[in-house]
């Protein structure tokens, strides 16, 4: 186990970022992750981490290898080989009944146009599905129906026995980029800038075969959809490459709230202008969502935004949370948020309430605090003035985990075992709660001394 010496801030990549980027010094009292364990097994970018159970996870990336790890000790348990190109999607497929004796499966899609199905307990490849016409970019499990979906240039429906139950016709050469399950035996699929709703028809006595039907195509986005996530049983959210965020009703598929930050290039641009516009577009790309019962947390370019569902407005934002694009975020207990970025950093944030004065400017830009949630609001309609004192929140940096030397692709949180991060530097880091680990080591030493009779030596 290595000891992590918490350093000061990193030097930002440019002077503009240096002024805006929030930093933290050596005093990181709310950051428990003071020890780290470096795990080495991959030979290329590690892009995916998936939780298998409370003590195991799997990693996969561009080397085509899948590795199963012990989240507590960092021990490599299994190495799964079978793909010839990079992994493009990974998902766990647990038994329908948690009491079943059958093993949990792991599904892995690859650029070699195959999907591997693995036994997580033995590492055996159960089957390699090879009938795909294009690369499968996303996998989704519908646990209730005990089936899984593969999204590529078409959408396929499969059972646990790996039978192809049904599939759609060719949808797009670019393929399905994201899938979520929504009520009514439906799924929402992001295909370019389109959101397509499909309904699954389950077998009956009259119709014994499975079927999948395209119900509706929604064209509300102006550019490619990058992120798609469920909010709750009645709503889901999508985000696009040009900063459009739409909240949808999961039952009738109508837009319930929207915010657009348009990017309109002029007809003629020189090379320098094109670079600047490209940078601007990246700054507003909605790269990832996570949600809880109260808020939507959005990674927008290099920034973080917290949108409250009840208040229908942004309650906190950190416009420059990282030096580069944020790739993954997740909400932790105790109002904490973790983000990882192309800048190689993993940062911990806390949502804190504060009293905003009337004179203090309201955050604008990506989210419009007043227009958000009012789909039919006319531009000429007067904006309601802010009350004298509005309780809002701030995102405060409470931890900066510096260990990777390249882009951090994603992370997993284990309540009992710490944080796991994967990176383009080919490494996985298991971040440990230093205080807890010290206590565990002391307890083991105490037990060892007691077993050897050295704890209470007899008097001469």
Curated annotation (Swiss-Prot):
Annotated localization: Cytoplasm
Keywords, comma-separated and alphabetical: Autophagy, Cytoplasm, Repeat, WD repeat
Protein name: WD repeat-containing protein 41
A cellular component term, taken from the record's GO annotations: guanyl-nucleotide exchange factor complex
Highest rank taxon of the organism: Eukaryota
Predominant location category: cytoplasm
Pfam families in the cross-refs: Beta-prop_WDR41
A single GO molecular function term of this UniProt record: guanyl-nucleotide exchange factor activity
Keyword Iron-sulfur: no
Physiological role: Non-catalytic component of the C9orf72-SMCR8 complex, a complex that has guanine nucleotide exchange factor (GEF) activity and regulates autophagy. The C9orf72-SMCR8 complex promotes the exchange of GDP to GTP, converting inactive GDP-bound RAB8A and RAB39B into their active GTP-bound form, thereby promoting autophagosome maturation. As part of the C9orf72-SMCR8 complex, stimulates RAB8A and RAB11A GTPase activity in vitro, however WDR42 is shown not be an essential complex component for this function.
Known partners and oligomeric status: Component of the C9orf72-SMCR8 complex, at least composed of C9orf72, SMCR8 and WDR41. The complex is formed of two protomers, each individually consisting of one molecule each of C9orf72, SMCR8 and WDR41. The protomers homodimerize via an interaction between C9orf72 (via C-terminus) and SMCR8 (via N-terminus). Within each protomer SMCR8 (via DENN domain) acts as a bridging protein between WDR41 (via C-terminus and N-terminus) and C9orf72 (via C-terminus). The C9orf72-SMCR8 complex associates with the ULK1/ATG1 kinase complex.
Species name: Mus musculus (Mouse)
Ubl conjugation in keyword set: no
Spans of repeat WD: 40-79, 82-128, 131-168, 220-258, 321-359, 403-441
GO biological process: one example: autophagy
Species lineage: Eukaryota, Metazoa, Chordata, Craniata, Vertebrata
């Amino acid at each position: 186990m290595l000891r992590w010496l918490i350093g000061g801030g990193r030097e930002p990549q440019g002077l503009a970022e240096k002024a805006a980027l929030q930093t933290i010094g050596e005093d990181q009292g709310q950051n428990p992750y003071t020890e780290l364990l470096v795990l080495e097994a991959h030979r290329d970018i590690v892009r995916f981490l998936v939780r298998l159970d409370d003590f195991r996870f799997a990693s996969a990336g561009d080397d085509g290898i899948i590795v199963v790890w012990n989240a507590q000790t960092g021990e490599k348990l299994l190495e799964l080989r079978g793909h010839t190109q990079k992994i493009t999607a990974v998902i766990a497929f647990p038994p329908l009944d948690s009491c079943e004796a059958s093993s949990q499966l792991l599904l892995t899609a690859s650029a070699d146009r195959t999907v591997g199905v693995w036994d997580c307990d033995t590492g055996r490849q159960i089957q390699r599905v090879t009938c795909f016409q294009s690369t499968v970019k996303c996998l989704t499990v519908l646990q209730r129906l005990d089936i899984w979906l593969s999204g590529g240039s078409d959408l396929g429906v499969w059972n646990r026995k790996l039978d192809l139950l049904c599939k759609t016709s060719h949808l797009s050469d670019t393929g399905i980029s994201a899938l979520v399950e929504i009520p009514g035996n439906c799924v929402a699929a992001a295909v370019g800038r389109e959101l397509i709703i499909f309904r699954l028809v389950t077998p009956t006595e009259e119709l014994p075969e499975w079927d999948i039907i395209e119900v509706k195509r929604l064209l509300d986005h102006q550019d490619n959809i990058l992120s798609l996530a469920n909010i709750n049983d009645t709503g889901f959210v999508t985000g696009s490459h040009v900063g459009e965020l739409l909240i949808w009703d999961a039952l009738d598929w109508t837009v319930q709230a929207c915010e657009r930050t348009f990017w309109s290039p002029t007809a003629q641009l020189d090379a320098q202008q094109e670079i600047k516009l490209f940078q601007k577009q990246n700054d507003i790309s909605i790269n990832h969502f996570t949600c809880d019962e109260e808020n939507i947390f959005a990674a927008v370019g290099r920034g973080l935004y917290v949108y409250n569902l009840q208040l229908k407005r942004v309650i906190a934002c950190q416009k420059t949370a990282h030096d580069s694009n944020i790739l993954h975020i997740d909400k932790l207990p105790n109002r904490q948020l973790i983000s990882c970025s192309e800048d190689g950093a993993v940062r911990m944030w806390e949502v804190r309430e504060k009293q905003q004065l009337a004179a203090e400017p309201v955050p604008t830009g990506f989210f419009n605090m007043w227009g958000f949630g009012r789909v039919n609001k006319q531009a000429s309609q007067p904006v309601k003035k802010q009350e004298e004192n509005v309780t809002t929140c701030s995102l405060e940096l409470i931890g900066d985990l510096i260990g990777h030397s390249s882009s951090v692709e994603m992370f997993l949180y284990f309540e009992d075992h710490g944080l796991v991060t994967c990176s383009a530097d080919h490494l996985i880091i298991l971040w440990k709660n230093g205080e807890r680990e010290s206590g565990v080591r002391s307890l083991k030493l105490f037990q060892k001394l007691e077993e050897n009779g050295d704890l209470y030596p007899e008097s001469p």
